[in-house]
């Protein structure tokens, strides 16, 4: 750093310190470094996008006015994320080298998130198997498990692993044709191809790749033309010994309205699940996030978050950021008491009534003046069958139980019966106002304390 620039910045910091609380200064300003100064602009590095956003919204004028107080000139302040600087330097230094090919051509512009690598993935008991399977596929594409099918709830790391596979393969072979796409984008591109009479172009795009990663594959269920097209794409790639990686929120056998021929192909390779992280993994995730974002958070605060937020990684990390922001806005240190205040609304929602299949059966049978035994019986009269279907629908929506387990709890029924009930109620809800009211009433009884 230029000596004059350092001197200017040190004097500026003294002024800013006098204007802010110690907590706010340490949280938002201390980690900043001046990069360069021109005739009108001062560029300042910041550790992450969250800090950049806060500085832009709340502290830019303070920084500009503090600098003006030192040198009698008003500069335009530009906050730049440090990682972006490194990326630009790496691109510049390797400009004569062959750049990473993460797409087949410009039209297929699918981006792998640079943050989602194996190195940044936190391994725990809940995801160890899925991580090991993903790494095995990345090390030996189309030789280990093909396809690899990763499933689990929202925000548990499925997308992270898929991007990590793509990065790992490209690091070893920059010329590999790696394509990552959501099932929604795949469907939309197919629709456009049909509309514009470009079917052949669409097929060439997805069948001439080395690695195809499709996220949230469950959303092609019910879309006949998309399933037809993907069936042939799958066959073409598999026959050519190309790697296919799919993710979903549930295993293939539990995806309703998925064609059997696709279901069987999804089960050809390896199916790996990701569960909700345990306490130790949640703590490790929070510590990793704090390190990456350059946040100073005590272990007891992270322990509090890990104890209260158990559902998924996104909510865990979101809770940490919320606490840091709350600390800055209230000019208070990050403590367990402050964390309790910052998360009280979130936690109160999380601590609502725990919904189980037994509870659903009790509430539904009471609502329709039936006995729980009726819902479990083999009776098929409408006054019993329809409430039973509603109870199965709610069991699928409000619990984490698998379809076979739900069927078992309703008199030992097959999982296909549960799928039928779920699909029927889902479809009827679109047009039946009375059913909507019934389901809403029962849901309130189930979820409210």
UniProtKB/Swiss-Prot annotation:
Q: Where is this region: Domain I, interacts with DnaA modulators?
A: 1-73
Predominantly, its location class is: cytoplasm
Q: Does the keyword NAD apply?
A: no
**Protein's GO biological process:** DNA replication initiation; regulation of DNA replication
Q: Annotated region Domain III, AAA+ region: where?
A: 111-327
Q: Where is this region: Domain II?
A: 73-110
Cell compartments where the protein resides:
Cytoplasm
Keywords on record: ATP-binding, Cytoplasm, DNA replication, DNA-binding, Lipid-binding, Nucleotide-binding
Q: Which domain of life is it from?
A: Bacteria
Name the segments for region: Domain IV, binds dsDNA: 328-449
Do you know which InterPro entries this protein is assigned to?
AAA+_ATPase, Chromosome_initiator_DnaA, Chromosome_initiator_DnaA-like, Chromosome_initiator_DnaA_CS, DnaA_C, DnaA_dom, DnaA_N_dom, DnaA_N_sf
GO cellular component terms given for this protein? cytoplasm; plasma membrane
Q: Which GO terms describe its molecular function?
A: ATP binding; ATP hydrolysis activity; DNA replication origin binding; lipid binding
Binding-site residues for ATP, renumbered to this chain: 155, 157-159
Keyword match Lyase: no
Could you tell me which SMART domains the record lists for this protein? AAA (SM00382), Bac_DnaA_C (SM00760)
**Domain topic, free-text comment:** Domain I is involved in oligomerization and binding regulators, domain II is flexibile and of varying length in different bacteria, domain III forms the AAA+ region, while domain IV binds dsDNA.
HAMAP family per UniProt: DnaA_bact
Family listed: Belongs to the DnaA family.
Relate the protein's function as given in its record: Plays an essential role in the initiation and regulation of chromosomal replication. ATP-DnaA binds to the origin of replication (oriC) to initiate formation of the DNA replication initiation complex once per cell cycle. Binds the DnaA box (a 9 base pair repeat at the origin) and separates the double-stranded (ds)DNA. Forms a right-handed helical filament on oriC DNA; dsDNA binds to the exterior of the filament while single-stranded (ss)DNA is stabiized in the filament's interior.
Q: How does it assemble?
A: Oligomerizes as a right-handed, spiral filament on DNA at oriC.
Q: What is the protein's given name?
A: Chromosomal replication initiator protein DnaA
What gene codes for this chain?
Answer: dnaA
